[in-house]
Each structure stands twice: as structure tokens, then as C-alpha cells.
Swiss-Prot record:
It comes from Arabidopsis thaliana. InterPro entries: IRX15/GXM/AGM. Its main location: Golgi. This is Glucuronoxylan 4-O-methyltransferase 2. The keyword Nuclease does not apply. Expressed in roots, rosette leaves and stems. One of its GO terms (cellular component) is Golgi membrane. Disruption phenotype: No visible phenotype; due to the redundancy with GXM1 and GXM3. Gxm2 and gxm3 double mutants show reduced stem mechanical strength. Methyltransferase catalyzing 4-O-methylation of glucuronic acid side chains on xylan. The chain crosses the membrane at residues 8-28.
């Protein structure tokens, strides 16, 4: 009886020990699986959250462009130039920007010009000091200078006669020019900057007492010809439906340098004359017209 009882107890003890061993093994496997799963999840998380090895480009819209979008979307004012006219200048700026862009006139198109030349320098020359204050107060990032003109539209016929004089055919810094059409009162950096694009859309020129664009057109051409880096300057003249803009642009920017005319806008491409001494003021086909 005792032997049978002892045998039963031994069997029961063995069973309990085996059960504990099995449970312990299962526990170890479960713990190992849990640890591996946690490590895998953690690794995946770190892999996803890990910063890229190379910095990503910033895709945020620049303030100057967002200002332009908001301004033109909400504005009811018609720009000075039509879509087709603006497209001519835009094609040039698409190729040259960021570049040095000089604009005669500060107007409702100014924010657009600065935006099309994003990353470059766009400088506006304006005759109306009060208007400069109004515009730059709203758009302080626009760079502009107040300038003074001493000509009048009523004198344009007399000034046109200067095209025959040697003083007005000579290429030099406008400040040193002996031509009466040369504008000498601008800030120094206007003359010292190599302008890639020039837009003549000012000063006022729609009545006889207005300063007119005679000197602006001549000086734009002189700045282009006097480039010391040997580059070419694209010059645009707006309102060529008026006699002054029409006649002075052909006479002093030269029909031979004319590239395109769209609506009231005329486009010239003028090379530096300093790169080759003896270059005539206008090419041989000066009579070419669009």
C-alpha cells in the first residue's frame, strides 16, 4: 500500500515538474517573440522618422510671389500692358532671370515685373515722388528711385534732330555724354550696373507739357551700348502707337536691332559696342520697320 502510494506521489510530482517546465519554455518563447516584435516595430518607426541624408529643397512660395498673386487676383485695376504685350517681355525674362532689370516707371505692373524676375534685381525709376511713397508703402520690397526729367513732349521734333550729331552717336557712360538727350541725374548705381533688360514705360508722355520718353529711350540705348561686360541688353518700349515712342525708338534704338513688335510694345536687342571698337551706332539696315 505504501509502495503504491509513494509511486503515485512520485508520478504526480514528475507531472507537475514537467508542466512547469513546459510553461517556462512557452514563457521564454513568448517573451522572445514580444521583444523581437517590439524591436522590429521600433526599427521601422526610426527608419520612417529618420531625417533624409540630403536636405530637401524648400517648396514654400516666396513672399514676393504670394504678394503678387494676392494683389492681382483681388485688383480691379487694368494693367498698363495687355496679355500679349506682357508675354513678349516674359519670354525674355524666362531666359534671363534672375537678372538686372531696369524699369522706367512705377505702376500697376511693377509687382508683376519684380515677380517675373524673382531672385534678380528689379529697379524702378519714377518721376512722381508721392506715387513712390504710395506704392512702396504697400509693397516695401519694390526698389525705386525718384528721378527728374527736364524735357517736354512739345520739344520732341527739335530733339529728334540730334540723331544726326556726332555727340549723340558717341558711345560712353551717359554721365559723360555730350548729347542733350542723355540723362545724367540718376543715382550712380544706375550707370554702373550692367542691365540685362530695360523697360521704357515712363515718364508721362500723353500731353505736350509732359516730359515725354525721348531722353529715357536714348539713355536706355546708351546704357546697353556701353556695357563693359560685352553682353546684350533687351530693351522694350511701350506705347509705340504715339509719335515720340515710335520715332525715337527706331532712331536711337535702331530698326536694325528690332526683334519684335506686339501691340503697343516694341522689343530691341542691343549688343555692347565696347566689345568691338568702330561699331556703328545703328546697323546698316536702320530703315527696317515692323
Amino acid at each position: 500500500m505504501r509502495n503504491k502510494s509513494q509511486s503515485f506521489i512520485s508520478s504526480k510530482l514528475i507531472f507537475i515538474c514537467c508542466s512547469i517546465l513546459v510553461l517556462f519554455i512557452l514563457f521564454l518563447k513568448r517573451a522572445s517573440f514580444s521583444s523581437n516584435s517590439t524591436a522590429t516595430i521600433r526599427d521601422e518607426y526610426h527608419q520612417k522618422s529618420k531625417c533624409p541624408s540630403t536636405p530637401q529643397q524648400c517648396t514654400k512660395l516666396p513672399t514676393s510671389l504670394s504678394d503678387a498673386l494676392v494683389h492681382y487676383v483681388t485688383s480691379e485695376i487694368t494693367p498698363q500692358q495687355t496679355f500679349d504685350e506682357v508675354s513678349v517681355s516674359k519670354r525674355v525674362l524666362d531666359k534671363k532671370s534672375p537678372c538686372n532689370f531696369l524699369v522706367f516707371g512705377l505702376g500697376h505692373d511693377s509687382l508683376m515685373w519684380a515677380s517675373l524676375n524673382h531672385g534678380g534685381r528689379t529697379l524702378f525709376l519714377e518721376e512722381d515722388e508721392a506715387w513712390i511713397e504710395t506704392v512702396t508703402k504697400k509693397f516695401p520690397n519694390l526698389e525705386s528711385y525718384h528721378v527728374v526729367y527736364d524735357t517736354k513732349v512739345k520739344d520732341s521734333n527739335k530733339l529728334m534732330e540730334l540723331k544726326r550729331t556726332e555727340d549723340c552717336k558717341a558711345v560712353s557712360d551717359p554721365r559723360d555724354s555730350k548729347c542733350a538727350l542723355s540723362l545724367k541725374g540718376f543715382p550712380a548705381d544706375v550707370y554702373e550696373t550692367q542691365w540685362d533688360v530695360i523697360m521704357v514705360d515712363a515718364p508721362t508722355g500723353y500731353h505736350d507739357e509732359a516730359p515725354g520718353r525721348m531722353s529715357a529711350i536714348y539713355t536706355a540705348g546708351l546704357l546697353a551700348r556701353n556695357r563693359y561686360d560685352g553682353g546684350e541688353t533687351d530693351v522694350f518700349v511701350h506705347d509705340i502707337n504715339r509719335p515720340v515712342e515710335d520715332e525715337f525708338s527706331v532712331a536711337f534704338l535702331c530698326g536694325g536691332y528690332m526683334k519684335e513688335q506686339q501691340g503697343r510694345l516694341r522689343h530691341f536687342n542691343i549688343p555692347s559696342h565696347r566689345a568691338s571698337f568702330g561699331t556703328p551706332f545703328c546697323p546698316a539696315d536702320i530703315s527696317r520697320r515692323f
